[in-house]
């Protein structure tokens, strides 16, 4: 049974649900986590997560299938990415089994908020790992909190699967060379807020960031990854140590090759070579796929497939991926975890 909400017009915003998961790391080990109705985190005013940004987060979704069951999409990959981020920030890893079991517990406890099949809406999960305790000085915490909360969401970008325009930004960088760009840390997103506002004020959906070293290559699209489709049936995505490795992107790389017969390519995407792409888009957990109609760079505006219509290959990839996520298309082995 589900609650009564306007599922098809949810948007992407916070909603307080009855239950979330909470676990503490103390004395060198994780304590047993539990579900709680308390949506407030209790931590010291001197916690390193507040002062020095020792925090990491993830994002994944639960999907209602046609038969009414609920499933998660590749949660083990989110666990592994959080572990890599934790290593980068000197935080304890959350074991994969603990992570996946906690996700399943949160979904099960809030199952009435998993949107009905056919609405296009999903239950978004936000795992969060933060350093807490009485610490002053730039050093790792002794204690940590791992928590997961959930909320039903619609489309991240207004309008869903429709082309929108993006602003190529070469005055601001998302991450520094050899910095934390490949980790999912809050500081990367804080740095993107100001250039993001510039783009939104100019009626662009988001920012496309260039490589911080030369400003000649595309890296990320705001909070998503960039991809391009060539006339030679290639699926191309940027490759850089300062790009967050997107689970959605790597899923699309696999599907492009094994389901659509395309050639997957990870490599440099130069801004002076955009004519090679007949279609382009942004992809990520929140956005899924957002077709890019055109991009503004300085005084130049470049259109890919169309500013009003979704390209045929982008549509096929979207249908294949969402079909797997909602249980309508057979998934590659290990991609789907059922919530019992």
Spans of model-derived segments:
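Helix-start/capping segments and mature chain N-termini
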Residues: 1-102, 106, 128, 135-340
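Extended, Lys/Arg-enriched charged tracts that mediate electrostatic binding to polyanionic substrates
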Residues: 116-130
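Charged, gly/pro-rich active-site loop segments
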Residues: 96-97, 106-120
């Amino acid at each position: 049974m589900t609650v009564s909400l306007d599922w098809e017009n949810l948007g992407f915003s916070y909603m307080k649900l009855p239950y979330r998961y909470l676990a503490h790391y103390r004395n060198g080990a994780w304590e047993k986590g539990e579900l709680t109705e308390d949506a407030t985190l209790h931590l010291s005013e001197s916690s390193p997560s507040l002062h020095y940004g020792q925090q990491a987060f993830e994002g994944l979704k639960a999907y209602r299938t046609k038969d009414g069951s609920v499933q998660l999409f590749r949660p083990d990959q989110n666990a592994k990415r959080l572990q890599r981020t934790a290593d980068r920030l000197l935080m304890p890893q959350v074991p994969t089994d603990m992570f996946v079991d906690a996700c399943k517990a949160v979904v099960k406890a809030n199952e009435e908020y998993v949107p009905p099949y056919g609405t296009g809406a999903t239950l978004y999960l936000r795992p969060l790992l933060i350093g807490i305790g009485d610490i002053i000085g730039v050093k790792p915490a002794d204690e940590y909190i791992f928590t997961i909360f959930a909320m039903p969401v619609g489309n991240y970008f207004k309008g869903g699967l429709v082309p929108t325009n993006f602003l190529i930004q070469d005055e601001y960088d998302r991450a520094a060379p050899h910095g934390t760009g490949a980790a999912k840390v809050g500081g990367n997103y804080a740095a993107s807020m100001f250039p993001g506002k510039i783009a939104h004020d100019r009626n662009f959906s988001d920012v496309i960031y260039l490589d911080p070293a030369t400003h000649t290559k595309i890296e990320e699209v705001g909070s998503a990854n960039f991809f391009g489709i060539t006339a030679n049936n290639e699926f191309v995505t940027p490759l850089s140590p300062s790009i967050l490795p997107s689970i959605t992107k790597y899923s699309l790389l696999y599907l492009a090759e094994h389901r659509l017969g395309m050639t997957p390519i990870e490599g440099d995407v130069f801004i002076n070579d955009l004519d090679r792409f007949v279609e382009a888009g942004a992809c990520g957990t929140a956005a899924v796929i957002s077709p890019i109609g055109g991009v503004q760079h300085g005084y130049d505006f470049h259109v890919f497939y169309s500013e009003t219509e979704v390209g045929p290959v982008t549509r096929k990839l979207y249908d294949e991926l969402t079909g797997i996520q909602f249980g309508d298309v057979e998934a590659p082995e290990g991609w789907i975890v059922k919530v019992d």
